[in-house]
Amino acid sequence: MTHDNIDILVVDDDISHCTILQALLRGWGYNVALANSGRQALEQVRERVFDLVLCDVRMAEMDGIATLKEIKALNPAIPVLIMTAYSSVETAVEALKTGALDYLIKPLDFDNLQATLEKALAHTHIIDAETPAVTASQFGMVGKSPAMQHLLSEIALVAPSEATVLIHGDSGTGKELVARAIHASSARSEKPLVTLNCAALNESLLESELFGHEKGAFTGADKRREGRFVEADGGTLFLDEIGDISPMMLVRLLRAIQEREVQRVGSNQTISVDVRLIAATHRDLAAEVNAGRFRQDLYYRLNVVAIEVPSLRQRREDIPLLAGHFLQRFAERNRKAVKGFTPQAMDLLIHYDWPGNIRELENAVERAVVLLTGEYISERELPLAIASTPIPLAQSLDIQPLVEVEKEVILAALEKTGGNKTEAARQLGITRKTLLAKLSR
């Protein structure tokens, strides 16, 4: 089973234990989120979809059993594994009765943990397989964010209809994938999906590509050619970057859409076509109409149903999934045993603004895999623009108690000094006694 699209939430008020588990699970290829209390865990479960929760029993304020009950109330399908340092039968039985899938004894045996995780996830996979559902990954789209779920819902609603669809989104967001998903989910799925990038061709070539031409219609036309409209007959025609078409071509395109018929270049014969049209653009066509650069009548013909594809900045929570997806692909292609990303590298990917969106992320991961000499991609393998991304000190709006922040800083100092408490205290500007006291809180 591949792990690049699996999200695990670790819930434990022991920050050092959380950090160790995070590093371990990321090393196994999982995406990991942390919660240092039951309340934090519930907030995250409300905001995101997790494949599995790993929760400690003994926590202050809200214990693991209470957290388990609340998680199951929010989402009964999430498998929860309980961790306990107390191997009492009563605790295990109570956890299982409350809805836990299994329990683990602390200190954790890592081999047992890995086996239990795979068993729990395999159990979930079997349950999901028995309930067929349309998912983004079926169409090459990866993500679990609210923005992606909204996009999938729109695709599911639009696909069964015959309505013309206008897809808008920045370059590199995956507009063609949306078009393919609509076609694959429609009644026309057994017929052709024909695609054409309108921005890549000049006016004369675009006319020939769309409508076809007769032999001898122009220099180099040594044989008759059917156009994309005819090739897509019975199926779907996807016109990418339609906002780049010239005014003259817009007139011909409008006529073809209205009359549902085309003429090859150099011919007077009309050919009836049955085509569903999906168009895409990165331009604001309403503004183009107001500026006189795009025909209003064609805009209304195209804009029957509008779908907005979110930029990568609008779905940052999907970046670990996408990065893992591309990592697996390029590791296999380049025959490299890459285990994952370092936490620092993943933080950089998440906080970078991605002007080129998914296409830029894909290129960055491919480059990193090619340059990698070790097992984990670090900031050294990332392009300079990404590696120099500033990471905000506060990465969420949640304000942690000061004692937790202090402990995190101390743990970081200890890691930097190789566990030397005296040196860590010196670098932090406190006494060794104060450091030990703060660690024991």
UniProtKB/Swiss-Prot annotation:
The modification 4-aspartylphosphate is found at residue 56. Its main location: cytoplasm. Residues 141-370 form the Sigma-54 factor interaction domain. CDD domains: AAA. ATP binds at residues 172-173, 329, 359. Transmembrane segments: none annotated. Part of the Zra signaling pathway, an envelope stress response (ESR) system composed of the periplasmic accessory protein ZraP, the histidine kinase ZraS and the transcriptional regulator ZraR. The ZraPSR system contributes to antibiotic resistance and is important for membrane integrity in the presence of membrane-targeting biocides. ZraR is a member of the two-component regulatory system ZraS/ZraR. When activated by ZraS, acts in conjunction with sigma-54 to regulate the expression of zraP in the presence of high Zn(2+) or Pb(2+) concentrations. This is Transcriptional regulatory protein ZraR. It comes from Escherichia coli O157:H7.
